[in-house]
């Protein structure tokens, strides 16, 4: 407190010394009296200087106060946002402290169970502390940025005042330019009206010319089409007539050839007729001497005379002559028919020649008409040329007038373009300044939103850590239940061993429902009911499922050593302390005192288990039993009551399961696939295989494993996290952390106290990495 009071003393001494020097330097006429108004001169000068400085300070302070009133609204908003951020920061710190306390309590409880869990919790606590430190650093950076932005806003507001003055000057120039543009627009409108009148007259003339050209073209096309159609028709008819003429000529030539052949044939026949007549006369003379000839023939028949040959030849000749007469008559008829056809062909030929002459006359008339139309077309084309020349002269006159008007209009448009450029520049400057102001406001809003999102993300992480702690606690409680259930199974097996010691036939009675063929006394009768074979069981076991026998059945009458109740911590042994794998791998071992129901070789053949890490085939799957789930309030009914254990998934308890938990479940399947662990499906296998059942060798397992899901064809482990514990597990109420409806997909919880390595969160990508500090998570 003494230092600020001691600092102004040397400054006052220096001021007084300078004042004395100034007074000493003044002339005697200018020096004041030694005691004006009863005060020394030094005090008066000091008071005047101090008053001058006070007035300057007052003016500067008033200017600052007047200037600061303009920013009161902005400062209030920024103060509200800063207060909200500070409150959220305080809440986060409180939540972080509570979470740290919960983690510390949880670590104290879990340190007795496993040392690996403590390391994971310590690493997570360190990561949370590092994130808190990063949050504090980011908050300090935010405050520095807010101060810089306030300075920028002040500078921009001073620029805005200058821009307003420029806008006033620009508006005045704009008004003067608008007046000039209105006068120019009126002149342009008058010029456009004149141009429109010229265009209307040009359009009318062009329409008349087009109509005349269209009519001429239509007449020409119609004339050509008619001429072409008629010419095509006549060409087709002429071609058909030529074809008919050619066919008739060919038929005429063929008929003439046939006639010549027939005439030659007739001549040959007429030459043979006199010969035939002479032969006929000779035959008549021979008929008179038939009687004599008969005697001669009879006399010469035996001698083999050849008198029959000339008679047969004469008969053949007569028959041939008759046939020739018939053919001659037919040839004459054909000849007459061909002559008639030739006469008809001559008539058609004459008609065709007349028709061709008519066509030639029509063609000459059409050619004369075509010449007339061509002359008319030439006259019309000459008229069109004259009209086009007249219209071209008018167009040249109008074009000259339009060029003069267009030049005047271009000059006016250039003036207007210059004015518009000035206006556009002014508007662009205004827009740039407005954009700068908007960008600064948006950057402020983005900074606020960015840090709000960071706060929300840290709240989410805290909530997810809290959920992970709950799931870990539930996992512990479920493991305790499983251990209790396994202890109950041990007590049941001990009771069964006692029953077997008292009555060795009780084993056959309990397993007749599944393995009657393997019994030593042969299969049971078909009419015997399953309830009769369960006479030695307790009434509690008869109410529910049949008793699940232990994985290894006793061979002798003594009791085996009792180990710990958890089957996961030791390898299952038989009654004599030998592991079950010895029985499977030693097929030549002698049977026990009581005797097994089947030989070891048969047991090996019946029990074909796949190697570790592979699944059962579909045909070799053991019968499955329905799994059950016990609630937190459910108790075990008795020592001999078998129950199977099943864990519900997080999908039913806490909503949809995140993708990371599904991947961790798949990793759990891969990691635990090489281990053969007894589960709730083993009793069902024992019941199904009968008293001679021997399980496969089991490898020693260390570490916590999860219950097996036997509903599918492949044996799978349950989810890595059991259902969450009650809300009051860590001392805080369940409503302390209210559920939040965060946008987007749900975040995966931290893998707290899990057998799998923790997975890092993805980095947060900022929308504008060039402006804000780059946060490192």
Swiss-Prot record:
One of the GO biological process terms: endoplasmic reticulum to Golgi vesicle-mediated transport
Highest taxon listed in the record's lineage: Eukaryota
Protein's cellular compartments: Membrane
Keyword Membrane: yes
GO cellular component terms, semicolon-separated: endoplasmic reticulum exit site; endoplasmic reticulum membrane
Nucleus is among the record's keywords: no
Membrane topology per record: Single-pass membrane protein
Residues that span the membrane, as ranges: 39-59
Alphabetical list of InterPro entries matching this protein: cTAGE_MIA/OTOR
Coiled-coil annotated spans: 118-269, 339-498
Principal location: membrane
Comp. bias regions, Basic and acidic residues: 572-591, 662-671
Keywords: Coiled coil, Membrane, Transmembrane, Transmembrane helix
Region (Disordered): 541-671, 721-742
Family classification: Belongs to the cTAGE family.
Protein known as: cTAGE family member 6
